[in-house]
């Protein structure tokens, strides 16, 4: 069984430029994933969802050791993996991922986040989760 405290680095993964609809409150990260919200904590590692459905957003079911063994055969990837241990490719809502990609053209992470947040406020459903207010994608 993987050690989720070290095999998944929530901070690095969320800030890697894959995900733009997130908020951080201390040890808690809130990620909008389509019509759901994921609350993630690093220590102790914990995932809670608004929908109460199990998610593998951080790909907890992947064999991280096997993946690293295969991808680090490339020298550049090997060097990068040492700088960002626990960085994961996320399993996010496909429609949200596609729109995020379109919005990201010729932009930077703060602007992409702002544009997507405005889309959520304009068209998303307003919900309360863990005593906080969010707009779903």
Language-model features: locations:
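HhH-family (HhH-GPD) DNA N-glycosylase catalytic core used in base-excision repair
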Residues: 1-137
């Amino acid at each position: 069984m993987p050690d989720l405290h070290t095999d998944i680095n929530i901070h690095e993964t969320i800030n890697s430029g894959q995900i733009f609809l997130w908020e951080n409150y201390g040890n808690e990260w809130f990620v909008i994933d389509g019509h759901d919200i994921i609350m993630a904590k690093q220590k102790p590692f914990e995932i809670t969802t608004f929908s109460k459905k199990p998610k593998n957003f951080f790909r907890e079911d992947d064999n991280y050791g096997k993946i690293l063994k295969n991808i680090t055969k490339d020298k550049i990837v090997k060097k990068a993996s040492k700088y960002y241990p626990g960085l994961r490719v996320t399993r996010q809502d496909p429609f949200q991922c596609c729109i995020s990609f379109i919005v990201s053209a010729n932009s930077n992470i703060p602007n992409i986040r702002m544009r997507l947040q405005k889309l959520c406020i304009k068209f998303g459903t307003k919900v309360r989760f863990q005593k906080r207010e969010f707009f779903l994608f």
